[in-house]
């Protein structure tokens, strides 16, 4: 049997590193279909830190796409597992037959499913991408994203799968020991990316709570984002006193980020698509409820796991937040499907599907 090849078709270092390390640590030892990778970006020590994997790096999207297409044409039994899919050349290859549907298995990452970019180049490309998506052999995604995708592509097979968020299962019960009282701290957004719509989110928080809460805005990623960070800071200071606004402009190490999240009482995410699942998982693990946009389909995954969900359209106050905290504290977090290690079973299943080992 031909070994499955995994493709990380865009240079997104933090996600690519997470995926490679997850496969190296959790999957490669038990499946030959979890070892071969083609990646856009620099090695930067990844090969050394992932010795169980065979990783080929490419300088750009086009060079990787050309190599994938060549392999697909040379052997029509060769199957590819695309992690996220921000590579237009690969979509066009699927549409034109360079890559066959039986070779194309796609793990949907939030941003590459939704058509939110306003640039003309993207607007022109989206219709072609929709046509190509009809030809995908199978998609893997969250429950909400599967539902969203099925509305336009009902004939494409879909299987439930969660991004491998870095988590320590031993912390699942830690939140129950913490007493929450006094001024609330609200986390706004999961990064400095503009998709978080920070200014609108800050205005929404202020409308609900006024200047009675402390707002923390993590903006240490992506790099070279100083102008936007300052824009958010100025908008925030028009709404909140300086002591109630904390803009984090430096990237935090994981343990420091975890400690920051555990000081919060509420997460507030205004984006209208699935993103930031890693941050949501860490907040839920810490017993901290989240406010989501009703257009963000991840609420379906949360309710399926019997987790309380608050919406940006709800009338929120401290009593409602504290009640959501109490509800969350009563949930057995060891049973949540999108938590580690529970998502591992899903990965083992989809690897077998993509490799053709199971129907």
Swiss-Prot record:
**Short name of any one Pfam family annotated for the protein:** Glyco_transf_56
Q: Where in the cell is it found?
A: Cell inner membrane
Where is it chiefly localized?
membrane
Question: GO CC terms for this protein?
Answer: plasma membrane
Q: Which InterPro entries match?
A: WecF
Its keywords, alphabetically, are: Cell inner membrane, Cell membrane, Glycosyltransferase, Membrane, Transferase
- Specify the pathway: Bacterial outer membrane biogenesis; enterobacterial common antigen biosynthesis
Q: Keyword Membrane: yes or no?
A: yes
Query: What does the record give as EC number?
Result: 2.4.1.325
Query: Its catalytic activity?
Result: beta-D-ManNAcA-(1->4)-alpha-D-GlcNAc-di-trans,octa-cis-undecaprenyl diphosphate + dTDP-4-acetamido-4,6-dideoxy-alpha-D-galactose = alpha-D-FucNAc4-(1->4)-beta-D-ManNAcA-(1->4)-D-GlcNAc-undecaprenyl diphosphate + dTDP + H(+)
* Any one of the GO BP annotations: enterobacterial common antigen biosynthetic process
| Cystine residue pairs | none
Q: What GO molecular function annotations does the UniProt record carry, in alphabetical order?
A: 4-acetamido-4,6-dideoxy-D-galactose transferase activity; fucosyltransferase activity
Membrane topology per record: Peripheral membrane protein
The family line of this record is: Belongs to the glycosyltransferase 56 family.
Which HAMAP family does the entry mention? WecF_RffT (MF_01002)
Give the protein's function: Catalyzes the synthesis of Und-PP-GlcNAc-ManNAcA-Fuc4NAc (Lipid III), the third lipid-linked intermediate involved in ECA synthesis.
List the protein's name. Answer: TDP-N-acetylfucosamine:lipid II N-acetylfucosaminyltransferase
Q: Which gene encodes it?
A: wecF
């Amino acid at each position: 049997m031909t070994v499955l090849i995994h493709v990380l078709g865009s240079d997104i270092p933090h996600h690519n590193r997470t995926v490679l390390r997850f496969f190296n640590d959790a999957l490669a030892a038990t499946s030959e279909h979890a070892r071969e990778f083609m990646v856009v970006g620099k090695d930067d020590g990844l090969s050394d830190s992932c010795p169980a994997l065979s990783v080929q790096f490419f300088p750009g999207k086009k060079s990787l796409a050309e190599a994938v297409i060549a392999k697909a044409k040379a052997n029509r039994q060769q199957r590819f597992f695309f992690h996220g899919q921000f590579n237009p050349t690969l979509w066009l290859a699927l549409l034109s037959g360079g890559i066959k549907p039986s070779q194309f298995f796609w793990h949907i990452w939030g941003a590459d499913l939704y058509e939110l970019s306003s640039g003309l180049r993207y607007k022109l490309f989206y219709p072609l991408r929709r046509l190509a998506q009809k030809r995908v052999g199978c998609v893997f995604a969250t429950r909400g994203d599967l539902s969203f995708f099925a509305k336009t592509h009902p004939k494409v097979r879909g299987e439930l799968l969660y991004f491998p968020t870095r988590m320590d299962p031993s912390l699942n019960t830690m939140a129950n020991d913490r007493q929450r009282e006094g001024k609330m701290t609200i986390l706004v957004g999961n990064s400095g990316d503009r998709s978080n719509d920070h200014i609108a989110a800050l205005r929404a928080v202020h409308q609900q709570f006024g200047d009675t809460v402390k707002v923390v805005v993590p903006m240490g990623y992506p790099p070279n984002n100083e102008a936007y960070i300052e824009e958010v800071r100025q908008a925030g200071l028009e709404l909140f006193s300086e002591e109630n606004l904390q803009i984090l402009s430096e990237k935090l190490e994981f343990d420091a980020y975890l400690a920051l999240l555990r000081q919060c009482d509420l997460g507030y995410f205004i984006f209208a698509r699935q993103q930031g699942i890693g941050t949501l998982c860490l907040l839920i693990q810490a017993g901290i409820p989240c406010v989501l946009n009703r257009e963000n389909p991840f609420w379906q995954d949360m309710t399926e796991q019997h987790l309380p969900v608050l919406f940006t359209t709800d009338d929120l106050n401290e009593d409602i937040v504290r009640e959501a905290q109490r509800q969350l504290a009563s949930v057995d977090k060891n049973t949540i499907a999108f938590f580690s290690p529970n998502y591992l079973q899903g990965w083992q299943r989809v690897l077998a599907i993509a490799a053709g080992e199971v129907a």
